[in-house]
């Protein structure tokens, strides 16, 4: 009986190791060499949140570990492609840990083929910065700021393309 248990254990171990090997060979090589991501502290990021040009700025705060954030990224990418010619700029601000930039953030951007500008916010343990973006912000993500030189709206919610586009229309009508 004991011998049978040992044999079953080693067979099981063999299956697990083979499965891992198959998964490892199925992974695609992703070229991360052309994925520029700058790391900013809040003082450096702030000018990107207060631009006075004639454009409409859409700033999304997200992280690779945030499932709702990842789910809504295609909506921001589509918004960028559809409305870039109408003066809409999209900025994706990653709130991942800076030490994960090479292991998680850049490979994620490359795999998802994100075309929007991506920056990573590194403000250490100081999380007081988010209240300066909007006093109602609890700090939860996803969160989005849409603004132009005349108006500024903040959203602590997830978006699909249709609802994001509807909010953008408010700014396009101005």
Model-predicted segments: where are they?
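Short, internal strand/loop/helix patches
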Residues: 108-141, 149
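Thiol-/selenol-based redox modules, centered on thioredoxin-like
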Residues: 141-174
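Conserved redox-active cysteine motifs that mediate thiol-disulfide chemistry
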Residues: 61-78
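Loop/turn elements at helix/coil->beta-strand transitions in domains of secreted/extracellular proteins
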Residues: 52-57, 86-89, 114-117
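N-terminal targeting signals for export/organelle localization
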Residues: 1-39, 152-154, 161, 174
